[in-house]
Amino acid sequence: MNDALREAAREQAGRDPHPPLGARDSGTMKAAATGGERGYDGGKRTTGRKKHILVDTLGLLVVVFVTAASVSDAAGAIGLLKRMSRFDQPRLRAITADSAYHREILYEYVARQWYEIQISSRPEGATGFVPLRHRWVVERTFGWLMQHRRNVKDYERTYESSESQVYISSVRLMLRRLTNMRMTPDSGAASNAQNPRLAA
C-alpha cells in the first residue's frame, strides 16, 4: 500500500511515479524495557532502536529498516538497500547521505548493486543551520513521523512491528496529501513541491 500511494502522490505532483534519486538517514529512539532487542547508541547516548529510512525527493517514504541502536549507519544502510531489493524501484540509482555514511564497506556494496552514493556536506566556511538539498528532505520526514506517538518511543517486541508502525504513519501522511486535506506538521509534504530547491 505504501508503494502504491507514493506512486500516486508523485503522479499528482507531476513527477514520474518511480524516483531516480533517494535520500537516506537514520534516527535513534528510546525503546521500552518491555520491548524486544535493543542496543546502545554511543553518539546519541540512547538505549533503544535505530530507524533507517529512504525517502524520495518529495520526502515520501520508500523503505524503512529497523535495527538495534548499536548498529552503525553504514551497516544499517546496507540492510536498508538489501530490503529495498524486494521493491520495484527501476529508476532509483543515486542516494544522498551525510558524512556518517562515508565508509568503504558501504561504497563497495553499492558499487556491486549499481547504486551511487552522494555524500552531502556543508559548504566550507558555513555557520549556523544550512539546509542541504535533498538531505533536508529526509530530516523533515523524520519530523513528520515523530508527530505520531508510536514512533516517538518503541514499545514493539519485534523489528518488523516497529517497521509496520512507520509504514502506517507514512500511509496516513500520503492519504492526507492525496485527498487534499488540510496539511498539518505531520502531513504537509505538499509544500516541498512548491520549493524549487528541493525539486528533482
Listing of model-derived features with the role each one plays in the protein:
Residues M1-A200:
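Short alpha-helical elements
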